[in-house]
A protein has these predicted regions:
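Glycine/Thr-rich beta-alpha phosphate-binding loop at enzyme active sites
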Residues: 44-60, 194-207, 241, 245-302
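Glycine-rich beta-to-alpha transition loops that act as phosphate-gripper elements at the mouths
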Residues: 82-85, 232-238, 305-316
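Catalytic cores of alpha/beta
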Residues: 89-94, 236-248, 312-329
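C-terminal helical cap(s) of enzyme catalytic domains, especially alpha/beta-barrels
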Residues: 112-127, 267-278, 336-359
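Alpha-helix-loop-beta-strand connector modules within alpha/beta enzyme cores
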Residues: 128, 138-153, 205-225, 277-304, ...
Length: 371
């Protein structure tokens, strides 16, 4: 591995680029024989070694994907979802494989281990994951110091949540919000993980109103302008959507992420791990999350950006969410199954789709399937 890292520039010249991409297909079975969390740790270490030059992931004609999000220009609307770089260790290295933006976290006020292991399960036959991690991270103070010492090179979101043992979840959100006000580009209020008991109660109107009103209070007192997003569960009832949208607009939330992992939707799964408890991500929730994008877009009428996440692993699946109303998309499970070249492939395919449909910029496609 160290020898490969030293010689990486030679390996990535000319036709050897194809050899390296092929190499990942050989490495994948070895990685998938590892425990999922050990494989994740290996991926983080690989990014720290910075052995993949950014030139490998450049795409011709990417200008058609240029957009802006929360006041910042980005090269493309493909983002890495929260959950991969939980404690802000490698976000700048992740940008180098082509992501337009990265979201770190979920970060809690205090460091915590999370739930007992094993807690991550691959569903290879379903191209999915089930996790019950429980917000394992290094804590807000450590994460803030890392970001301050390593200025983000592109749009960085910070996903926040409460500690498992807290006696006041709202206060935990407020603590994290105040800590991260001065850094990053946006803060995501994560009320949708199925792995922290009581967290999804914030989808109830009274609980959500109380939380958002207090977030607004500290935002108004702060000297820092910061965009706030809300990350929503895919296990909502349709009857809850209008109430949530009204509160989002009332309290001037700047964006919404649709959706987190699902506690349901197991009927079509065939993998042996499909019975595990936890949040389901990947292909099995692709249509579900896209439908939520469509429903929220209609309710919001384009007033704030939607970030679509859930089953994005190709240019086609990215375009489906954008056409349904997403201004940008995120992925995570697709990266696990397809490797670091997935971002380049999505961008190449997305460029071709846009051109074939007569769009001159990605923004023209947002909500196009509804117009």
């Amino acid at each position: 591995y160290k020898l490969f890292w030293r010689q990486r520039d030679n390996w990535f010249n000319g036709k050897k680029v194809e050899n390296i991409i092929l190499m990942f297909s050989f490495i994948r079975p070895f990685i998938f024989n590892l425990d999922p969390e050990k494989a994740h740790d290996l991926a983080i270490k690989s990014f720290k070694y910075n052995f993949l030059p950014s030139s490998l992931f450049s795409v011709q004609g990417e200008e058609i994907l240029n957009t802006s999000l929360f006041g910042k220009e980005i090269s493309n609307p493909i983002g890495l979802a929260a959950g991969f770089d939980k404690s802000a260790e490698v976000y700048n290295e992740i940008f180098k494989i082509g992501f337009g933006f990265v979201e770190i976290g979920t970060v809690t006020p205090k460091q915590q281990f999370g739930n007992e292991k094993p807690r991550v399960f691959r569903l290879e036959k379903d191209q999915a994951l089930i996790n019950r991690l429980g917000f394992n991270n290094d804590g807000s103070d450590v994460v803030r110091k890392r970001i301050e010492a390593n200025i983000p090179s592109n749009l960085l979101g910070i996903n926040i949540g409460p500690n498992k043992d807290t006696d006041n979840m709202t206060n935990d959100f407020l603590k994290c919000a105040e800590i991260f006000f001065p850094i990053g580009d946006y803060i995501t209020i994560n009320i949708s993980s199925p792995n922290t008991k009581g967290l999804r109660d914030f989808h109830n109107e009274d609980d959500l109103k109380n939380l958002l009103s207090k977030i607004n209070e500290i935002r108004e007192k702060s000297n820092f302008k910061k965009s706030f997003l809300l990350k929503i569960s895919p296990d909502l009832e349709d009857s809850q959507i209008s109430g949530i949208v009204n509160l989002i607009l009332e309290y001037k939330i700047d964006g919404i992420i649709l959706t987190n992992t699902s506690n349901k939707n197991r009927e079509s799964l065939i993998d042996v791990n499909s019975k595990e408890i936890g949040g389901l991500s990947g292909k099995p929730i692709k249509e579900l999350s896209t439908e939520f994008v469509r429903k929220f877009y209609k309710e919001l009428n384009g007033k704030i950006p939607i970030i679509g996440v859930g089953g994005v692993d190709s240019g086609e699946s990215a375009f489906e969410k954008i056409a349904a109303g997403a201004s940008a998309v995120q992925l995570y499970t697709g990266l696990i199954y397809k490797g670091p070249n997935i971002v380049k492939e999505i961008k190449k395919d997305l460029i071709q789709i846009l051109k074939s449909k007569g769009f001159t910029n990605i923004n023209e496609a947002v909500g196009s399937s509804l117009n």
